[in-house]
């Protein structure tokens, strides 16, 4: 009984809760079998102390020694190694251990913290609970590995977890690699933390273990890291360079996303596919409305003037001038509050949507797109009329000929053709009426023009063929007397009868008839000469 008490006094409470606290470091004590024995001893010690503490409280020493004999046999194997920690107070009494009962004894640890320790074991062959690993993991990459599939710090952490959660099954017969490496590092024994004094940690940057576990990352171990069971596996360094100060977000250009052109109103699935930069035509950049207003309101600064000049160079010039630049509008200018902000444009509008539509002329914006041919338009009505070219709809018909058109302006243009035709017909009718009136006045100038040669040609033969001793003064009354009846008598009826049968549409034939008229007149003149000869005695008598 006294031997059992002395056996229990060999180990202090701190040594029982921490078996490695007083034992000298030796390679044999670092193996798992010794750890199991010390843990079982620390868990079984409260049973011995509980059995021994009851007789001490009652003052009976014989019962405690008899009940502690069984424990002495279990702890006898360690008496030689723990003789250096013999407590000299054992001879004086057990007063230092009276406050330690079976309930509070196993809760004391090295740092006065409670630890959860199982107090009952069904058998001594039960495996140890998972040991808490308090070492540090290395995050340095392996210097001489070329494969960059997995980063090294991940595997160094995983290897430590694998070796701690899966201790080798033959711990009772053969030492594990973790225990052997702990014994070779010559570190001071302190529980299971095993901190190392040298610079190399317990688990190096490239840990090695003989039997790789295929349950964790099976594909990288079978493909990227081929090796047999006995070879060491080198793990690659991280595939990324050293960490930078700021994380740079990659900027993806907007033209790779076809629906990002919200400025053009193209956020529809019918977007035209992306074209190459070579096939694109150079168009002036779109200027927002705020920038245009800034040109009008703050044109005094030099920067805005420079921007204004560059902007004016990009303006789309109209293909033609306005037909009626000074045409009066329905609304007077002072009642149109919305003015165009462009300096070179003096247009004003009574509605804001009209101004918005007008500004698109300056900016070149075309927000309305045809879903069939992907053509863009600046106005919605232009898009509506354009769609009719695809559908074949022609709602506008001509009132005169019935021809149909898709646009109203086309019908208006076509109607002008009919108006021009009407004007031509009216002109033709006027020309025809004037022609008939002019043809009705033709006989009078012909009748008056042709007797003159007859009159001039008639007196000369009459005067020259008249052989008379009458003085020269006699011929003048003869020539002046007789032409008057000839002019009034013979030529006019002969010519009138000749031209009455001539149609007015054949002036060539009219020119051919005066010869006959002249001939007739000459024949008449011959008769007149006879008449002159007949009346000559009377004339002489008168003289």
From Swiss-Prot:
<keyword id="KW-0238">DNA-binding</keyword>
<dbReference type="GO" id="GO:0071506">
    <property type="term" value="P:cellular response to mycophenolic acid"/>
</dbReference>
<dbReference type="GO" id="GO:0045944">
    <property type="term" value="P:positive regulation of transcription by RNA polymerase II"/>
</dbReference>
<dbReference type="GO" id="GO:0005634">
    <property type="term" value="C:nucleus"/>
</dbReference>
<feature type="compositionally biased region" description="Low complexity">
    <location>
        <begin position="429"/>
        <end position="486"/>
    </location>
</feature>
<comment type="subunit">
    <text>Interacts with SNAI1 and SP1 upon 12-O-tetradecanoylphorbol-13-acetate (TPA) induction.</text>
</comment>
<keyword id="KW-0804">Transcription</keyword>
<keyword id="KW-0539">Nucleus</keyword>
<dbReference type="GO" id="GO:0090090">
    <property type="term" value="P:negative regulation of canonical Wnt signaling pathway"/>
</dbReference>
<dbReference type="GO" id="GO:0003700">
    <property type="term" value="F:DNA-binding transcription factor activity"/>
</dbReference>
<feature type="site" description="Interaction with DNA">
    <location>
        <position position="357"/>
    </location>
</feature>
<dbReference type="GO" id="GO:0043523">
    <property type="term" value="P:regulation of neuron apoptotic process"/>
</dbReference>
<dbReference type="GO" id="GO:0035914">
    <property type="term" value="P:skeletal muscle cell differentiation"/>
</dbReference>
<dbReference type="GO" id="GO:0072110">
    <property type="term" value="P:glomerular mesangial cell proliferation"/>
</dbReference>
<feature type="region of interest" description="Disordered">
    <location>
        <begin position="165"/>
        <end position="213"/>
    </location>
</feature>
<dbReference type="GO" id="GO:0032922">
    <property type="term" value="P:circadian regulation of gene expression"/>
</dbReference>
<dbReference type="GO" id="GO:0060086">
    <property type="term" value="P:circadian temperature homeostasis"/>
</dbReference>
<dbReference type="GO" id="GO:0005654">
    <property type="term" value="C:nucleoplasm"/>
</dbReference>
<feature type="compositionally biased region" description="Low complexity">
    <location>
        <begin position="57"/>
        <end position="66"/>
    </location>
</feature>
<dbReference type="GO" id="GO:0000122">
    <property type="term" value="P:negative regulation of transcription by RNA polymerase II"/>
</dbReference>
<feature type="zinc finger region" description="C2H2-type 3">
    <location>
        <begin position="396"/>
        <end position="418"/>
    </location>
</feature>
<dbReference type="InterPro" id="IPR021839">
    <property type="entry name" value="EGR1_C"/>
</dbReference>
<dbReference type="GO" id="GO:0071504">
    <property type="term" value="P:cellular response to heparin"/>
</dbReference>
<feature type="zinc finger region" description="C2H2-type 2">
    <location>
        <begin position="368"/>
        <end position="390"/>
    </location>
</feature>
<dbReference type="GO" id="GO:0001666">
    <property type="term" value="P:response to hypoxia"/>
</dbReference>
<dbReference type="GO" id="GO:0008270">
    <property type="term" value="F:zinc ion binding"/>
</dbReference>
<dbReference type="GO" id="GO:0010385">
    <property type="term" value="F:double-stranded methylated DNA binding"/>
</dbReference>
<feature type="region of interest" description="Disordered">
    <location>
        <begin position="409"/>
        <end position="487"/>
    </location>
</feature>
<dbReference type="GO" id="GO:0043565">
    <property type="term" value="F:sequence-specific DNA binding"/>
</dbReference>
<feature type="site" description="Interaction with DNA">
    <location>
        <position position="403"/>
    </location>
</feature>
<feature type="zinc finger region" description="C2H2-type 1">
    <location>
        <begin position="338"/>
        <end position="362"/>
    </location>
</feature>
<keyword id="KW-0090">Biological rhythms</keyword>
<keyword id="KW-1017">Isopeptide bond</keyword>
<feature type="site" description="Interaction with DNA">
    <location>
        <position position="351"/>
    </location>
</feature>
<feature type="site" description="Interaction with DNA">
    <location>
        <position position="336"/>
    </location>
</feature>
<keyword id="KW-0832">Ubl conjugation</keyword>
<dbReference type="GO" id="GO:0000977">
    <property type="term" value="F:RNA polymerase II transcription regulatory region sequence-specific DNA binding"/>
</dbReference>
<feature type="site" description="Interaction with DNA">
    <location>
        <position position="379"/>
    </location>
</feature>
<dbReference type="GO" id="GO:0001228">
    <property type="term" value="F:DNA-binding transcription activator activity, RNA polymerase II-specific"/>
</dbReference>
<dbReference type="GO" id="GO:0045893">
    <property type="term" value="P:positive regulation of DNA-templated transcription"/>
</dbReference>
<protein>
    <recommendedName>
        <fullName>Early growth response protein 1</fullName>
    </recommendedName>
</protein>
<dbReference type="InterPro" id="IPR036236">
    <property type="entry name" value="Znf_C2H2_sf"/>
</dbReference>
């Amino acid at each position: 009984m006294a031997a059992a008490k002395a056996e229990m006094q060999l180990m202090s409470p701190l040594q029982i809760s921490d078996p490695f606290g007083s034992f000298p470091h030796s390679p044999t004590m670092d193996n798992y079998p010794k750890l199991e024995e010390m843990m079982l001893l620390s868990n079984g010690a409260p049973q011995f102390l509980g059995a021994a503490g009851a007789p001490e409280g009652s003052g009976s020493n014989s019962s405690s020694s008899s009940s502690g004999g069984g424990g002495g046999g279990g702890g006898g194997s360690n008496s030689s190694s723990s003789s250096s920690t013999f407590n000299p107070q054992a001879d004086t009494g057990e007063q230092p251990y009276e406050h330690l009962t079976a309930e509070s004894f196993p809760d004391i640890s090295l740092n006065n913290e409670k630890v959860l320790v199982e107090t009952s074991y069904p058998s001594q062959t039960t495996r140890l609970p998972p040991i808490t690993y308090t070492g540090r993991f290395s995050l340095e990459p392996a210097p001489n590995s070329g494969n960059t599939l997995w980063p090294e710090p991940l595997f160094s952490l995983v290897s430590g977890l694998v070796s701690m959660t899966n201790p080798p099954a033959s711990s009772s017969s053969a030492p594990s690699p973790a225990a052997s490496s702990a014994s070779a590092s010559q570190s001071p024994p302190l529980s299971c933390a095993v901190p190392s004094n040298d610079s190399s940690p317990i688990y190096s940057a490239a840990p090695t273990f003989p039997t790789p576990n295929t349950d964790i990352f099976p594909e990288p171990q079978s493909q990227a890291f081929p090796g047999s069971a006995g070879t060491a596996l080198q793990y690659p360094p991280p595939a990324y360079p050293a960490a930078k100060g700021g994380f740079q977000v990659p900027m993806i250009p907007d033209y790779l996303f076809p629906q990002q052109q919200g400025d053009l109103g193209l956020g529809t699935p019918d977007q035209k596919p992306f074209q190459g930069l070579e096939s694109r035509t150079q168009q002036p950049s779109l200027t927002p409305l705020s920038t245009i207003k800034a040109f009008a309101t703050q044109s005094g600064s030099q920067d805005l003037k420079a921007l204004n000049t560059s902007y004016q160079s990009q303006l789309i010039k109209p293909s033609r001038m306005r037909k009626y630049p000074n045409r009066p509008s329905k609304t007077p200018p002072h009642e149109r509050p919305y003015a165009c902000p462009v300096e070179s444009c003096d247009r004003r509008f009574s509605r804001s949507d009209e101004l918005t539509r007008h500004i698109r002329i300056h900016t070149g914006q075309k927000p309305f797109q045809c879903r069939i041919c992907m053509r863009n338009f600046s106005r919605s009505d232009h898009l509506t009329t354009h769609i009719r070219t695809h559908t074949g709809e022609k709602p506008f018909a001509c009132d005169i000929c019935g021809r149909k058109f898709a646009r109203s302006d086309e019908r208006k243009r076509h109607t002008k053709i009919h108006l021009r035709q009407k004007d031509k017909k009216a002109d033709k009718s006027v020309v025809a009426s004037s022609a008939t009136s002019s043809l009705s006045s033709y006989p009078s100038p012909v009748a008056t023009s042709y007797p003159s040669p007859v009159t001039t040609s008639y007196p000369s033969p009459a005067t020259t063929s008249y052989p008379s001793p009458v003085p020269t003064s006699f011929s003048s009354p003869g020539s002046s007397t007789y032409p008057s009846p000839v002019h009034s008598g013979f030529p006019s009826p002969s010519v009138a009868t000749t031209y009455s049968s001539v149609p007015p549409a054949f002036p060539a034939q009219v020119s051919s008839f005066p010869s006959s008229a002249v001939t007739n007149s000459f024949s008449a003149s011959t008769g007149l000469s006879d008449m002159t000869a007949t009346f000559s005695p009377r004339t002489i008598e008168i003289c």
